[in-house]
Amino acid sequence: MSLMLEPNPTQIKEERIYAEMGLTDEEFAMVEKILGRLPNYTETGLFSVMWSEHCSYKNSKPVLRKFPTTGERVLQGPGEGAGIVDIGDNQAVVFKMESHNHPSAIEPYQGAATGVGGIIRDVFSMGARPVALLNSLRFGELQSPRVKYLFEEVVAGIAGYGNCIGIPTVGGEVQFDPCYEGNPLVNAMCVGLINHEDIKKGQAHGAGNTVMYVGASTGRDGIHGATFASEELSESSEAKRPAVQVGDPFMEKLLIEACLELIQSDALVGIQDMGAAGLTSSSAEMASKAGMGIEMYLDDVPQRETGMTPYEMMLSESQERMLIVVKKGREQEIVDLFEKYGLAAVTMGKVTEDKMLRLFHKGEKVAEVPADALAEEAPIYHKPSKEAAYFAEFQAMKMETPKVENYKETLFALLQQPTIASKEWVYDQYDYQVRTSTVVTPGSDAAVVRVRGTEKGLAMTTDCNSRYIYLDPEMGGKIAVAEAARNIVCSGGEPLAITDCLNFGNPEKPEIFWQIEKSVDGMSEACRTLQTPVIGGNVSMYNERSGEAVYPTPTVGMVGLVHDLKHVTTQEFKQAGDLVYVIGETKAEFGGSELQKMIHGKIFGQSPSIDLDVELKRQKQVLEAIQAGLVQSAHDVAEGGLAVAISESAIGAKGLGATVKLDGEATAALFAESQSRFVITVKRENKEAFEKAVEAIQVGEVTSTNEVTIHNEENEVLLTANVDEMRKAWKGAIPCLLK
């Protein structure tokens, strides 16, 4: 579309063209007031994309302010490309998680691939080398052909991008529930390492300094991607394929190396990824954060399509692009550096003092807008919140234990539920050993990556049981953070901080906004108690299809520090004769459990409860015992309860089983999902020291029989299961469903 055809300011107002771009009548009036005139077409586009929920968090900011974001190790909290946490020895870990849900629903391969590419850029734009990727995925039930297609393509897209770029995908989670059928969730997390002096910010300081565009050229892909991410999916969403970007991992690999070399140069002033809202957000945010303005000449933007308008160039979300500010007079060095990698680096503007974002094209001024108005002055909405109607009903239910006839058959059925079953089909497609720093590969409680040149490691995980959060958002929010920390501790790490990805339905519905508020309350409380501040994250709203919202899914990405790699602990049994301990009491808690869903086909009632002080005490005891060398294996008890946790520890070992005695009512003892529990094995000679250090109950021992046998307190056998048969069922479940 050429400039001739763009509607003029009067038409934009009278024909309400701004509404098609996502601005409300009130918002358009605010823009008019800020500018003191009617905006032109390009300016309307700038505001519509920067004031979208995706870029401005206008509906979620009041809630996000509840998160604790500071701590003695936090070097950078929310507000930059990614958060940064000190890990000692002048080193720091940089990490962030983001969603790419809407694009993945309509173009799953590219949607997932570019989600990975975008989160990697957020990390290296801080000056860090990306060392690991994780992902948290949600799909409908695998019986559906459409879900199979989405699942296969999303995994292929993640693998395709991560493997080509040479960053290991080391962990994550995949869960399946009917509510995600029309709206899958694809959350990608990247972890990087940095030395303190290399930390860079996305800020445009120094009037007269040069603004440069580096990386891939700009096309028409992804225009209004941020706006598309801020509305519900519908039948017409298929037509929005152009709003899905296309990724090139080989280009990004070169971009990483070039940018990491650039960061060592004193010519660099600021650097930011062109992510959501492309050139608009990177320029407006860099100027606003520095209290400056930016002037840009759009004729100089490298374009891969002809006749692009200023509107299209500013709103394109083409991938693999960065905006940088360099010291005046040093431009040629930058051009030479990028040329070495076969990449473009083009001067396209300068930093100004007047705090305006000013755009020129073909000799004319095409936009003049205050940078702060775009980046900081979006309206903030305090949405009405109303307790969901189902909540009181679920809370009032008397908890019933599901009826189980045959414990062994039930255990086998649980091991084959896709949410519990082995995800080997997924992670076998990922290169998780590239860079050769992966110490604990996918499949244990958390992945561990070596910090090169030290004896330290980084433990990392993503967690969120959205069924619990649906039943009780506040309790479920606490559990999500606690389970992530439990996974880090079981791997020998000290939990440091979290990044979050808040996936919810339409915030304009009061019951959805209530879910958001309550789950953030629960997460915030858990973060404070467990001392894991939130250092950044992402909000993804409008995850609905035909009015049906997904379960509230605030995914937690957590990183922990393994002080010495000899503390690294995994979930599988190590040797026959070791003693098996259970930490934590089991109650008949089945609300939102795998057993409840399997037997009743739906979830209802109260979610499991959690006491965060008890959780903290147990985590500290377990971590200290691991660091003291008293623990052989550690596994958190999660979906499927104790029977599944013990079976998983046996399945991961070779030729080992266990004989265990569990007290209490059999179904609860085996399958309840009470929180703050661990299965730990200990060498016989460490029995006394371990029991002194940790409040735990010895329930049995590891055997060389290749069988798991569980007795009740009367010593009657509840079940005996062959480990090879369990492994076959557990590993075969997902491939079998995909056939």
UniProtKB/Swiss-Prot annotation:
ATP binds at residues 57, 96, 500, 537. Mg(2+) 2 binds at residues 122, 273. Mg(2+) 1 binds at residues 98, 538. The keyword Metal-binding applies. InterPro entries: PRibForGlyAmidine_synth_PurL, PurL_linker, PurM-like_C_dom, PurM-like_C_sf, PurM-like_N, PurM-like_N_sf. The active site is at 54, 100 (proton acceptor). GO terms for cellular component: cytoplasm. The keyword Ribonucleoprotein does not apply. HAMAP family: PurL_2. Monomer. Part of the FGAM synthase complex composed of 1 PurL, 1 PurQ and 2 PurS subunits. This is Phosphoribosylformylglycinamidine synthase subunit PurL. It comes from Bacillus cereus (strain B4264). The gene is purL.
